[in-house]
């Protein structure tokens, strides 16, 4: 008879129960890492400095035996379950670690999605206010909103840099920039040229201004996915996200961002992110110290996908680091029965934030907690509203943004955005 299956989702619970049931780990062991590898099997990794310590070895063997008993196919035989490794290796695997018990941690080795495990400040100080336009699903108007926001901010005297980082589905630049105004190079060009030390040579030739911005007091610079000619776009795209021997992909993105900010000296940077839960999107949400506009529609599939992300932040103790930089956007708000739709949307957003990111107001130490009622104005779950209109429907040209059309669709959104900007994002406070 086959043993009952122990599914992947039960590993954490079983690891916690197994580790907490054992006697205390000897202090001489230092930190103990339970490493869940790419196959989902769990081994113990500790410093090779304790390899000859009999008391430490006995404690590790007890833990390895218990893990083998409770993890099923995700466990390994006791004799293969302990690895003595260098301190340098232990340091390299600590990103996203979760505490099982004092001095015992579970860590994951991943092919993708590892950038969702941390929420950090950039290694270089930024001067401009940054906003990431993100969604778990595509087709919700992020490109149009980036163009409208740039238009609005430039009309009010701001210098704006817009970066098209949706590199798998580029379209912002072609929608906003006329062919004769597109720059020689784009973001994909910088990433491949920077690999051979030529990044700074293309920075000055990879932004351009849309024609409609020339009459404004401010300025708009668009950094497109590719230049005037796309060239070998797929070959370049295949090299964009690679980690180098010196810098991982998020740090390379920081270098590009800082170089463009130094070149264009913007007041505001708008980052159009890739949609979905891939690492590529994670870097623009968690790693660039931007305020994140979360585009959503009132559909169960949207809320389900956002719950996956929010639950991950909650389970990995990242809620406090990320929640103050989030604002939900009601994208594609319908023309008819709008009030009822927005009520349902706000309730769905409140459920999402309340269940995963807001503090429990019933807790005795929650007097200063981060929590909001359903109808609190300007709370993270209180949506910035974009109304669907025929004038800004899919495929509409953004070469000539008409004030009347923008006002009809975006008046409420822009008013809320201005209040958000005046309040300042966490990185500006």
For every predicted segment, state its role:
Residues 37, 54, 78-87, 227, ...:
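Beta-strand-loop-alpha "switch" segments that mediate conformational coupling across diverse proteins
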